[in-house]
Amino acid sequence: MKRGWLIFFCALCLCLFGCAAQSGGGDKPALPQPESTPSRAQGTSAAQLVPERLSKNESGVPMLRGYDVKSETLETLSVEDYLPAVLAGEMAGDWPLEALKAQAILARTFVLQFVSQKESMYDGADISTDIKEAQAYDAAGVNARIREAVKETRGEVLNAGGELPYAWFHAHSGGLTARAKEGLDYEKAEPSYTQCVKGMENDEAPAE
């Protein structure tokens, strides 16, 4: 259990928070500290963060209208059915289960936050499989480990002061992440929960 939480928070820190590196001699300015830190939300607390525009199935799971760019079709499916292909598109299916679980929480937060803040570029859709719009999507790459990661985190999202945070993540930080305004050309005010995160001691990019 401790190992699982450690991996989760390492992934969370590397995926969500960022600030620019400082260079030059002399004393370095203190790195900005976050005003708040997103926490895991599940059950009733997570349900309260689901965008009102989304309908729910008989089990209370949010439903999405997803546009598949390959088949050029619009399909209605639950968030939980949408996530496995997203994980397969973003991570290798043989990664440690705890890493996949962390990514599942990030991906679930990402799609719900997207729906609450944006409109899909495809008519009638809440989100699409277009990587230019949202997350990678690879239905053919889904395996048992990925399905288990989604199942074990069912309904869990990140909660930042009663709101869904921007669940940004990356494949490799290069040793130090950048804050949203610098790394993503983010035009709004810097989110209160972003901060500088250095890479792990062994911060090598995994083989594709």
Positions of predicted regions on the chain:
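Conserved, single-site charged/polar hotspot
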Residues: 1-208
